[in-house]
């Protein structure tokens, strides 16, 4: 097997094309490809471009809605709730972070909740960006199915890292 090195832009474009071919909308494919390429660039290979084949298969199988458009509500002054509408997580993350960025100057703290999303990947990268750029504390939550059993139990109860 040979290895080929791609630029960030080329890797991002290749991933976006694979997602588009599998049923993702243009914006969702672009945002997802960017996030996956960025995870690899930041050394988080487990949540990087290696996810493209699985995401593409899940799009083709209808497990995730490629044309979903996230909706945003503000349940309180310092919080944002995003419904990903069973779509890819990254458009929802982008929507939540954009809202949070516009609100953080007013309260110093913003919580972003994302529900009904696909795999949120390296969510912490986006939360770190918001905190660094705004000079404020930032936290994000997303749902996750039970996959981890508490100590001493054989029954899964906790999700996998749903807080960033």
Question: Each predicted region: which residue ranges?
Answer:
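Glycine-rich anion/phosphate-binding loop at the beta-strand->alpha-helix junction
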Residues: 109-164
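Flexible, glycine/charged-enriched surface loops at secondary-structure junctions
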Residues: 24-31, 46-48
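Short glycine-rich or small-residue beta-strand-to-loop segments that form or flank ligand, phosphate
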Residues: 18, 81-85, 110-115
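Active-site cofactor/substrate anionic-group-binding motifs, chiefly glycine-
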Residues: 48-101
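N-terminal amphipathic, basic helical "cap/leader" segment at the start of enzyme domains
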Residues: 38-47, 51
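Generic N-terminal amphipathic, Lys/Arg-enriched alpha-helix
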Residues: 1-22
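Glycine-rich phosphate/diphosphate-binding loops that line cofactor/substrate pockets in enzymes
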Residues: 26-27, 101-106
């Amino acid at each position: 097997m040979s290895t080929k090195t791609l630029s960030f832009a080329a890797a991002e474009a290749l991933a976006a094309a694979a997602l588009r071919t599998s049923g993702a909308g243009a914006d969702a494919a672009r945002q997802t490809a960017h996030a996956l390429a960025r995870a690899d660039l930041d050394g988080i290979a487990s949540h990087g471009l290696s996810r493209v084949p699985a995401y593409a298969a899940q799009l083709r199988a209808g497990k995730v809605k490629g044309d979903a458009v996230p909706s945003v509500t503000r349940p309180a002054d310092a919080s944002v709730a995003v419904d990903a509408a069973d779509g890819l997580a990254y458009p929802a993350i982008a929507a939540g972070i954009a809202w949070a960025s516009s609100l953080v100057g007013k309260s110093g703290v913003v919580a972003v909740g994302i529900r009904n999303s696909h795999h949120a990947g390296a969510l912490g990268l986006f939360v770190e960006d918001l905190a660094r750029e705004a000079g404020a504390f930032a936290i994000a939550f997303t749902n996750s199915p039970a996959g981890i059993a508490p100590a001493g139990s054989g029954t899964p109860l906790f999700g996998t890292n749903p807080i960033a």
